[in-house]
Amino acid sequence: MFRKHFRRKPATSSSLESTIESADSLGMSKKTATKRQRPRHRVPKIATLPSTIRDCRSLKSACNLIALILILLVHKISAAGNFELEILEISNTNSHLLNGYCCGMPAELRATKTIGCSPCTTAFRLCLKEYQTTEQGASISTGCSFGNATTKILGGSSFVLSDPGVGAIVLPFTFRWTKSFTLILQALDMYNTSYPDAERLIEETSYSGVILPSPEWKTLDHIGRNARITYRVRVQCAVTYYNTTCTTFCRPRDDQFGHYACGSEGQKLCLNGWQGVNCEEAICKAGCDPVHGKCDRPGECECRPGWRGPLCNECMVYPGCKHGSCNGSAWKCVCDTNWGGILCDQDLNFCGTHEPCKHGGTCENTAPDKYRCTCAEGLSGEQCEIVEHPCATRPCRNGGTCTLKTSNRTQAQVYRTSHGRSNMGRPVRRSSSMRSLDHLRPEGQALNGSSSPGLVSLGSLQLQQQLAPDFTCDCAAGWTGPTCEINIDECAGGPCEHGGTCIDLIGGFRCECPPEWHGDVCQVDVNECEAPHSAGIAANALLTTTATAIIGSNLSSTALLAALTSAVASTSLAIGPCINAKECRNQPGSFACICKEGWGGVTCAENLDDCVGQCRNGATCIDLVNDYRCACASGFKGRDCETDIDECATSPCRNGGECVDMVGKFNCICPLGYSGSLCEEAKENCTPSPCLEGHCLNTPEGYYCHCPPDRAGKHCEQLRPLCSQPPCNEGCFANVSLATSATTTTTTTTTATTTRKMAKPSGLPCSGHGSCEMSDVGTFCKCHVGHTGTFCEHNLNECSPNPCRNGGICLDGDGDFTCECMSGWTGKRCSERATGCYAGQCQNGGTCMPGAPDKALQPHCRCAPGWTGLFCAEAIDQCRGQPCHNGGTCESGAGWFRCVCAQGFSGPDCRINVNECSPQPCQGGATCIDGIGGYSCICPPGRHGLRCEILLSDPKSACQNASNTISPYTALNRSQNWLDIALTGRTEDDENCNACVCENGTSRCTNLWCGLPNCYKVDPLSKSSNLSGVCKQHEVCVPALSETCLSSPCNVRGDCRALEPSRRVAPPRLPAKSSCWPNQAVVNENCARLTILLALERVGKGASVEGLCSLVRVLLAAQLIKKPASTFGQDPGMLMVLCDLKTGTNDTVELTVSSSKLNDPQLPVAVGLLGELLSFRQLNGIQRRKELELQHAKLAALTSIVEVKLETARVADGSGHSLLIGVLCGVFIVLVGFSVFISLYWKQRLAYRTSSGMNLTPSLDALRHEEEKSNNLQNEENLRRYTNPLKGSTSSLRAATGMELSLNPAPELAASAASSSALHRSQPLFPPCDFERELDSSTGLKQAHKRSSQILLHKTQNSDMRKNTVGSLDSPRKDFGKRSINCKSMPPSSGDEGSDVLATTVMV
């Protein structure tokens, strides 16, 4: 029954080469490999061989086939790596077992003691198996499919391992790492290993998750009922295995089979100087011709036959080629001009190459290497070498005329060739009459220099004279000599005068005169003063320079105008050679210039320097013509800057300040209470008053408290003592009244009574400014100097008039005064210049610098940093100039400032960008990208979230941070349809397309890649483009091509590209494989392609390809999130949607969909949803389409879709473990190989028996009949199995769009298809159709609604996957850039082989 299925086909060239290549890898010879491909009709020849030989050959072929299959199978499923676990800590404070008993006790005594237990003897056991959910439950009893191991005793009840390697468990694996796993870790008491594990169990923990091979550890912490265990795990591939499943094998090598190292992903990295798939091709020397050169070692350049040169780019001529070249082709002989023949050795232009005809004879080529000479009159011979008379050779040169001289003997002269014999064979003898023929000999050769006596050498000729006449030459003017060969030198006599140079000419001469003379022989004097008048070049240049210097100086407007006027007036037009002269006087051979004032030199072009010793006091002198100007330094004036400017003349000091004139400046001495450079600032130190009593006065040092008499101290805080003892108790007090006591006086004459009352004395006697004196009449006050009055209560004002000078402030005292002097003055009355500093003159740490009276320099303050002013009392604004960067706020004080930085920056001046990626906030091995005041995480496959904390394989990870049943990840779940999402105002760079929702403790994620980040996105804080931190250090931000903008203007966007060592920009970092990028996608089970035709006139402003792609991702995510989790199975891959303009078009977008996981069940679901989303029927509910396009520009890109074409591969139902599939396939192939072997063996046995006379025809016919019946049934079954690869999406597409999926052939085709199985294979599976080529803008929408559009799904029979074509729909005649596809009847396919590619075309 296997005979039909394994029937051999004629071997094509490609299959034969692949078979031979496989044979080479197994060490088989090409002969053996070729033998297995021979056609079947040659098999009967084997029957004639002995049976033993036939059996051996069949056995050897079968063994080779089985060995090839097994080697390929082993290579397919080979993998290697280690699962590693290290114990970090265990805490068992009670030393209890999990059952509550104590560690280290016999079973019969455990019930007697539960506290104060002995320490445990702790070891750990690891069980590793396939992934199991919590509902399934993880237990060691069900087996450890990935392996198990036990550590040695690590310690007591509680311990922390400083060296985690002590408690390490390593489980090697040789299968494809599944990424997901379940581990069970047990802590056991090793007191008595004979006890069952359940009685020795201290604690047990299990963990189920996903881990990718990496050198990084993942730490896990288990808090159990009895103990706490901290451990860490990781997976590492073996040394020569790579990628996430440890299945990529790469071993570095440097031998004849390859020269490469291994990359981080197992890719082969060629060593320096090698290239190719296996790096076995050497890179030749730079510039080595790739066709004509080769190399076995890097850097060499070995030429192939026929080529030479250091770079093998020089061809070699054919051997023996004489006058030819190879002309860019090896072993060629391309003849040069005038040469012919196979070896280019025949002269085709003998006349031009050799010039054989002498004496002006005309040469004519007659044949290769042949010629004929036509001689002039008087010449003859084969080469015109015979001279019949002397003038025939034109011996007279330079226009001379030859004349023959005859004599009495008129014998002719005969010229022969150089053989030296005449026609008669006699030699030629020299005579005196031959002296005129010397012109015929070569230069330097005498006539008697011939080798034979009596022979006259005439170059190649020899003369034989019998009776020869002579000739004479009549020379032209300027020539002389026997043959007019001598030029007469007319300059020999020196005809040129006054130093002129004589140049000899033919028949004359010419004199080149100096500039001062002219004439034929330079005899006439030139009048230089009569030269045409022209602008004085030197004067103009000087004028320009002078004007520039004047304008750049600090002259006043009046002085500036005068200087410019003087400079212009001093220049004039030139008089001949004199530029700035009064008169030009001609002299023999020369001239003299009478210069104007201020000018000198031969031509008066030099401006005399008038600035020597003129300007004073550091002024800058500007030299004019016969004049100068002084640009004075600051503080001086006058023509020579000799006068010091009195800056105090305008009284700049305010508020009564005294102005002190200085050099170039002034200084204000401010009165009490004022400060500043102009005394413009009032100093108020008495508000509020610091004096407790009395009144406050401002002083340069601060303030002064003028206290009342009974007070003393700086702030009048001290009380003066009172005098209460006699005799000071009365009479000396200003407040004594006459009613202090009562006295009655009685006289004899009257009876009146007088009463005097005296008040009790109080205060100081004599008001404290005098002494109380006693006298006969009573007490009185003797006042101190400066006071007066009965009780010395009046203070004499010594400050009136003011005795203080130079602005000093007078302070009245007790009988004296004090002068508070202004800065720079001192003395009792402030009349002396101060040379020293007084205490406290300079404030805030300033240093006082003494003055110098001889220089009128007063003491001044040198302020400390941060202070300024006359007394260093003014604080400098440290925040002036904005020292804080990046939006920082400056705060300052006296001599200091500090920056309060904005979020994301630090440092003293806020220039340091805070690295939010340190410490690492992203989880699960994600890549952290630092930003301004934040960070972003690029999650690895299988993770999502702001910090990649959501593990897609863990249903509860998205719900761990949620306080209720709905987590924060609900943005996409609340949208009812894709149109709602499109109208929410999302930007093109929205990264929320990949979101998770948490409902009732279970999470679901869209797991959709959101596109590359836009490195030209504007930062809301800095408002600057090219956001800092998006691109890494070795990357650059590459802006998107302008062609991707569908309708300008578009927002600027770009993506980060790696910068290669050659300074070239690498391709974008797309997660999808390059085989599924737009414009180069290969449609297969893991890659689908959609082609979208747009009407550009309906596309809204600002729409771009990436904007359309971002919108499609968001819309797809909104639909995927609604699907139940069971639709996608466990551990789905990441979906990737990529978009780009179709090559060569500007209105067609190619979109590819792929998954990071092979045979991902969500891929066909996503493709079906995209078909629904991009259908025009989805917009039926929009009543005002034009208004919607104006309001939402991004939707306009979708509403402008004219046609959608979808291509996908047929995806088989069901899924299984890839390792199991590989093993089952291997077993099946082995069984098939064994069956082939048995079949061949019995076939030969039957053939042998047939040849021996045995008749097996009935049984063979029956067997053939059964096989043909089985084949027909199989063909019918295959036809019935033909289904839509979009699976569930087809029904939803029909319900949502109202479109009919035509999955069966047309009725008329179906009827004919039932006639034979062959017709089933050749007829197309779709009816002919003819869509309109153009939709009218006004009626197109209605017609589209009325028309019953069809989505045609058909299997392309002749698709070529390598060229990325899909049958007849992608034929060269099809122009996808047009408005519609004209689906005519497709011709039947010519073959029954092809890849399973389905194409869907949607007309909208």
UniProtKB/Swiss-Prot annotation:
The record ties this protein, via InterPro entries, to: DSL, EGF-like_Ca-bd_dom, EGF-like_CS, EGF-like_dom, EGF-type_Asp/Asn_hydroxyl_site, EGF_Ca-bd_CS, Growth_fac_rcpt_cys_sf, Jagged/Serrate
Q: What keywords does the record list, in alphabetical order?
A: Developmental protein, Differentiation, Disulfide bond, EGF-like domain, Glycoprotein, Membrane, Phosphoprotein, Repeat, Signal, Transmembrane, Transmembrane helix, Ubl conjugation
User: SMART domains under this entry?
Assistant: DSL, EGF, EGF_CA, VWC_out
* Compartment list: Membrane
Q: Which GO terms describe its cellular component?
A: apical cortex; apical plasma membrane; axolemma; cell surface; plasma membrane
Tell me how this protein sits in the membrane: Single-pass type I membrane protein
The name this protein goes by in its record: Protein serrate
Organism (species): Drosophila melanogaster
